[in-house]
A protein has these predicted regions:
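Gly-rich Lys/Arg/Thr-decorated short loops/hinges at beta-loop-alpha junctions or inter-strand turns
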Residues: 5-13, 114-120, 150, 157, ...
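Ferredoxin-like iron-sulfur electron-transfer modules
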Residues: 2-26, 34-54, 72-78, 184-206, ...
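Cofactor-cradling patches in redox/metallo enzymes
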Residues: 122-176, 299-374
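Hydrophobic or amphipathic alpha-helical targeting/insertion segments
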Residues: 58-62, 67, 165, 349, ...
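Short cysteine clusters
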Residues: 21-27, 31, 52-58, 62, ...
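Conserved mixed alpha/beta catalytic, RNA-binding, or beta-rich assembly cores of soluble enzyme
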Residues: 84-139, 144, 270-311, 315-316, ...
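A short, flexible N-terminal coil/short beta segment enriched in small residues
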Residues: 41-43, 60-96, 247-278
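Peripheral docking tails and interdomain loops at the edges
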Residues: 179-193, 355-392
């Protein structure tokens, strides 16, 4: 981990360059987690890394560019755009665009060819991390249309990310208007919701017991479940705990994940990783590279969405090991997801796997993007253990 941190020049994934910081304290006001504060003794802005959840709202807000951020900084995003000549740039939050199929439907695109030729697409953990300079460069300098797809403000996984983006968009529209420029900036908000099939419901109330928002409840007479879609955050926990498969989550449907596992198993994969898309950023952008190592990563909306049946299927079909990557409980973006993964998924799995002497082939790891190298470290450690078990 020290080598990785030294390579990037970060102790963690974020730091403040005090040499250019003006201590305007805009970052302090913008931070949703009270992770940045002004130190009266040192007269510097300081990041409390334990509170920080790597939303990068501070990075996008800083007028002096004094906050250095490891993931998706302005330069790396602009470099990515240079590789595409598509006339439209789409930047979407991972939280509401789970798949290319979903993105095509949202954009009204009929084929992958049409999508790739007309749109350059980028999925970010939160669109609120975009700096205003990016939008100015894309619209004015490059003459492209920008489509921004944040979550609805009340459903932002980073609390104020969507709000921060909309403030920038409103500011830029006013400036462009005063300059007589007609910018092509379109905002399409959205949020994932579960799909409920009442004809399958057993009325067992598992969904009600595990739902972190109170959106799922059992009503009488029936009994049958009912969902308040106004407060559903699309974590998918109810889909994982439902024994009748009466609930599904768009983009992460049970059958689609099952089909993906079957496809992966035919490629002689050593290790399958179910990775919460909020607890690791870099690896989810380099999934293809991992395949060369015999590792396949399936991004998940939350670690709580991991279904024990999918884990058992992976082992049954010949995959040597399964790893679940989750946020630390206190940092879960969906309230109870990490706890569900640990106490529901793992406990149920251990009951079955211990009978088959396979419990050592499934592991759960808690990490965060702020801890540089931890994901790779845990992955390689488990892969080594799997190879040793296979050898004996």
């Amino acid at each position: 981990m020290d080598a990785v941190a030294s390579l990037w020049g970060y102790e963690y994934g974020i730091e403040v360059n005090s040499d250019i910081c003006a201590t305007c304290r805009m970052c302090e006001k913008a931070c949703p987690f009270n992770a940045i504060s002004y130190n009266e003794k040192t007269e510097r802005m300081e990041v409390d890394i334990e509170r920080c959840q790597m939303c990068a709202v501070c990075y996008s807000t800083c007028p002096a560019s004094a906050i250095q951020y490891l993931y998706y900084d302005l330069a790396s995003i602009e470099n990515s755009i240079e590789l595409s000549s598509a006339p439209m740039i789409v930047v979407a939050c991972r939280g509401n665009v789970p798949s290319e199929e979903n993105l095509m439907r949202r954009l009204g695109v009929r084929s992958e060819e049409e999508l790739h030729s007309n749109y350059f697409t980028m999925l970010l953990p939160c669109v609120g991390r975009l700096r205003a300079e990016f939008i100015i460069d894309a619209v004015v300098s490059r003459g492209r249309k920008v489509v921004l797809m944040p979550c609805e403000e009340d459903f932002c996984r980073f609390v104020r990310g969507s709000e921060a983006l909309m403030k920038k968009v409103q500011m830029l529209r006013r400036i462009f208007s005063e300059l007589g420029i007609s910018p092509e900036i379109e905002v399409r908000r959205g949020v994932l919701k579960v799909e409920f099939k009442p004809y399958r419901c057993l009325g067992c109330a598992e969904c009600q017991a595990f739902c972190p928002t109170g959106a799922a409840r059992v009503i009488h007479p029936g009994p049958v479940a009912d969902f308040d879609m106004d407060i559903c955050k699309g974590c998918g926990i109810c889909a994982a705990v439902c024994p009748a498969h009466a609930v599904d989550l768009k983009g992460w449907e049970f059958d689609k994940i099952s089909a993906k596992i079957h496809e992966i198993s035919e490629k002689k994969v050593k290790l399958l990783v179910f990775c919460c898309q909020w607890c690791e950023f870099g690896a989810l952008d380099r999934i293809a590279e991992r395949r060369e190592e015999g590792i396949e990563i399936i991004p998940m909306p939350c670690s709580g969405r991991v279904d024990p049946l999918h884990v058992i299927q992976a082992l049954y079909e010949g995959i040597k090991g399964v790893m679940i990557i989750a946020c630390p409980e206190e940092e879960c973006k969906l309230d109870e997801g990490s706890k569900t993964a640990l106490y529901f998924t793992m406990e149920r799995l251990n009951e079955t796997l211990s009978q088959l002497n396979l419990e050592k082939r499934v592991r759960i790891c808690f990490t965060s993007p702020k801890y540089i190298g931890r994901f790779d470290e845990e992955l390689q450690k488990f892969l080594k253990d799997i190879e040793e078990m296979s050898a004996t």
